[in-house]
Amino acid sequence: MQAHGGWNALFWCNHDQPRAVSRFGSDTTYWKESAEMLAVAIHFMRGTPYIYQGEELGMTNPHFTSIDQYRDVESLNYYKILRQQDKSEEETLDIIAQRSRDDSRTPMQCDASENAGFTTGTPWIGIADNYKAINAAAQMDAPDSIRSFYKTLVALRKKMPVISAGKIEFLYPDNADLLAYRRYDGETELLVLCNLREREIAKPLPVGWTDAEKLLGNYPDTADTLRPYECVVLKK
């Protein structure tokens, strides 16, 4: 695609997929770290990154506990199929909770008030159980919030042509724990490293990158390894 000038649509979330931070990261212990790592993973790629509503806040799956809370017809039908296959109620709800399209269809979490500030009426579907902590108002003026991190990503993409127009080379394709790639345009080079696991992994640096400048990361300091869901962007 790159060789012929192709252009990708880059996204984790949409109205038919579970929330990325719950699906590919951690929506508990490493919620912030994994949400920011997933953002870096695609926002430094070649193409157009999409931000689905609430993704910039780290919105999670809603953690529904009853089938009565779901509205998605596929989820309701799949519930019946799983129960007919003698899956227990607990196991069935666990499967639905991980896969349902309703995971990304709950109202936008605006603030900590009733119905997450989305409406004074009755929403057609329930609100995620963590809306009092995860909402736009809580992050609006917080410099260390996920929302602020997204603003930094957008600003860097506008400022640095290598991100929007440079070439991309993926590295270490056999390492399932790591997403790594290089961006370059003849003037600037970037190295993007993303730990996809909830554990520490090795931090491989190609030749010539040991003394590179740290452009961005989701941990305040620098380590010789990649910590759980850590992302690092180096520049030279």
Residue ranges and their predicted role:
Residues 1-209, 213-236:
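Active-site and adjacent substrate-binding regions of carbohydrate-active enzymes
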